[in-house]
């Protein structure tokens, strides 16, 4: 993979170079000391992946991510030494299309390969997303008599560009929105709590992490909060599970959507927002085949038109909509 590093700190650049050296297939093709330089270098030589710092002179990583995704889109991972202090910037960058975030690898520890492992895993996942994905088995639905009834649910999946899209969608809903909402966003567990807090503050909706064993409820927006998948169980409660182990993204949107197909017998709407790859497309199709309304974000309003495009390609979405129209449509569905 051809990789670029955008960072103004020589020690951080060296740490990233050393980490990447453990995987011979990775090649650093250029290094930029600020965001403005990175924008220009990306025009001249677009890499497969950019490792982007947040705090830099001239142009920061948030604006650089926005410019690059608009002009020469490629995969971007945010690399930071202080994720808690930079949490808002992290989610702003992800809103512009950054795929993920990882800590800067440590230099000088007793096990440099172990220190490099989190970064290398992120890159492996992104490399997989840029390739082809095999089809999933179709879900087998359970009869209505075998499950307990729940009333109204909105199941939302998002990835790259998701934080900003979720903020816009949730801002468009009133506090008394008459349906439970569960969000599955591709974000590492260490950032999930910060994302829930940020979404709560930015959108004005009560957003928190979903707890094992709780039931989706009206008036609360639940965000999948671990590196395991989240599922709806037969009794209507939520559970985290390591299975299936072969899913690259954890939590998987497909896994949650398919569990909704099996066990939710009230009204439900599936929404698939911006993101790279195909996660969520098959699950959305299963929801449509179950008789639920399914909505995919349109290309023009998507930061990364990957997952919604995959859904549209297999006719998984009943409706394809601009982002700003999705909240009003949900209100229309649940207030008739």
UniProtKB/Swiss-Prot annotation:
InterPro entries in alphabetical order: CheB-like, CheB_C, CheY-like_superfamily, Sig_transdc_resp-reg_Me-estase, Sig_transdc_resp-reg_receiver
Record GO cellular component, one term: cytoplasm
GO MF annotations in UniProt: phosphorelay response regulator activity; protein-glutamate methylesterase activity; protein-glutamine glutaminase activity
Keyword Manganese: no
UniProt KW keywords: Chemotaxis, Cytoplasm, Hydrolase, Phosphoprotein
Domain Response regulatory: 2-119
Record GO biological process: chemotaxis
Top-level taxon in the UniProt lineage: Bacteria
Record-annotated active site: 159, 186, 279
One matching Pfam family: CheB_methylest
Catalyzed chemical reaction(s): [protein]-L-glutamate 5-O-methyl ester + H2O = L-glutamyl-[protein] + methanol + H(+); L-glutaminyl-[protein] + H2O = L-glutamyl-[protein] + NH4(+)
EC number: 3.1.1.61, 3.5.1.44
Protein modification: Phosphorylated by CheA. Phosphorylation of the N-terminal regulatory domain activates the methylesterase activity.
Domain CheB-type methylesterase: from-to ranges: 147-336
Root EC class: hydrolase
Subcellular location: Cytoplasm
Modified residues (4-aspartylphosphate): 53
SUPFAM superfamilies for the chain: CheY-like, Methylesterase CheB, C-terminal domain
Annotated family: Belongs to the CheB family.
PANTHER family the record matches: PROTEIN-GLUTAMATE METHYLESTERASE/PROTEIN-GLUTAMINE GLUTAMINASE, PROTEIN-GLUTAMATE METHYLESTERASE_PROTEIN-GLUTAMINE GLUTAMINASE
Domain comment (free text): Contains a C-terminal catalytic domain, and an N-terminal region which modulates catalytic activity.
UniProt cross-references to HAMAP family, sorted A to Z: CheB_chemtxs
Function: Involved in chemotaxis. Part of a chemotaxis signal transduction system that modulates chemotaxis in response to various stimuli. Catalyzes the demethylation of specific methylglutamate residues introduced into the chemoreceptors (methyl-accepting chemotaxis proteins or MCP) by CheR. Also mediates the irreversible deamidation of specific glutamine residues to glutamic acid.
Name of this chain's protein: Protein-glutamate methylesterase/protein-glutamine glutaminase 3
Gene name linked to the record: cheB3
């Amino acid at each position: 993979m051809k990789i670029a590093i955008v960072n103004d700190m020589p020690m951080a650049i060296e740490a990233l170079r050393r980490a990447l050296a453990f995987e011979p297939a990775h090649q650093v093709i250029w290094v930029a000391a600020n965001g403005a330089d990175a924008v220009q270098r990306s025009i001249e030589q677009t890499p497969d992946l950019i490792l982007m710092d947040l705090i830099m002179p001239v142009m920061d990583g948030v604006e650089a991510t926005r410019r690059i995704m608009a002009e020469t889109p490629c995969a971007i991972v945010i690399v930071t030494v202080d994720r808690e202090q930079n949490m808002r910037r992290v989610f702003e960058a992800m809103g512009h299309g950054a795929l993920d975030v990882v800590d800067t690898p440590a230099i000088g520890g007793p096990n440099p390969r172990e220190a490099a492992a989190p970064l290398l895993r992120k890159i492996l996942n992104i490399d997989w997303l840029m390739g082809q994905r095999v089809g999933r088995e179709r879900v087998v639905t359970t009869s209505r008599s075998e499950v307990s009834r729940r009333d109204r649910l909105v199941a939302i999946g998002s990835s790259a560009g998701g934080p900003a899209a979720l903020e816009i969608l949730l801002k468009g809903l009133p506090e008394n929105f008459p349906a439970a909402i569960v969000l599955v966003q591709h974000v590492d567990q260490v950032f999930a709590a910060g994302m829930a807090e940020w979404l709560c503050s930015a959108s004005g909706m009560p957003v928190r992490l979903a707890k094992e064993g709780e039931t989706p409820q009206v008036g609360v927006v639940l965000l999948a909060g671990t590196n395991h998948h989240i599922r709806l169980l037969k009794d209507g409660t939520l559970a985290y599970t390591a299975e299936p182990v072969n899913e690259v993204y954890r939590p998987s949107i497909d896994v949650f959507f398919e569990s909704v197909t099996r066990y939710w017998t009230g009204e439900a709407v599936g929404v698939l927002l911006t993101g790279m790859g195909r996660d969520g497309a098959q699950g959305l199709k299963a929801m449509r085949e179950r008789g639920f309304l399914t909505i995919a974000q349109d290309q023009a309003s998507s930061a990364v038109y990957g997952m919604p495009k995959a859904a549209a390609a297999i006719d998984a979405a009943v409706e394809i909509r601009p982002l700003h129209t999705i909240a009003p449509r949900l209100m229309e569905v649940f207030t008739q």
